[in-house]
Amino acid sequence: MNDTPQTLEKDVRDNLLLLYDFDKDYDVKLLKYSENVIFKITFKEAFPVVLRIHRPGYHNIEELEGEILWMDEIHRDTDVELPVVYRGRDGRFLQKMTTFSGEEVYVSVISFLEGSPLGELKDDELIKGLESLGEITAKLHMQSINRDKIGRAHV
């Protein structure tokens, strides 16, 4: 990606309301700038969301859509707490945005889930978190087995 975090933040500010039906009063904060660029969008009158700018050329549109559709299925079919994926104004999960440098990128928006980085947890919290991770992994394993049985494609 040829854009800086600052120009991408401006791109998000300029395009968010064109792509999604969100409240006009919001704040944008960069959370992570790496292979994907992640912004937290905080609204005055609604719950925060996360906007992800997907790294261009890393995954094609079918792979990105597959990942999002699987998240949506997991959310619907299990009790695993996952972010809700938001659809854009056009009804699609993935939206195309042109950056300041002219590069076309895909963006997606999910609900924000509170959490703490693993490195900040105390030992007892870490053990509890890892036990929970094991339970979630088992549920995801069962969901993927059931997904295969009903003929849903692999992501």
Spans of model-derived segments:
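Short N-terminal amphipathic alpha-helix/helix-capping patch enriched in small hydrophobics
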Residues: 12-13, 34-37, 67
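Conserved small/polar residues in nucleotide/adenosyl-binding loops
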Residues: 153-155
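ATP-binding pocket architecture of kinase catalytic cores
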Residues: 44-148
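Juxta-kinase regulatory segment immediately upstream of eukaryotic protein kinase catalytic domains
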Residues: 1-28
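ATP-binding glycine-rich phosphate-binding loop
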Residues: 20-43
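Alpha-helix N-cap/helix-start motif at coil-to-helix transitions, marked by capping-box chemistry
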Residues: 6-7, 32, 104, 131
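N-proximal short alpha-helices
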Residues: 4-7, 11, 37, 58, ...
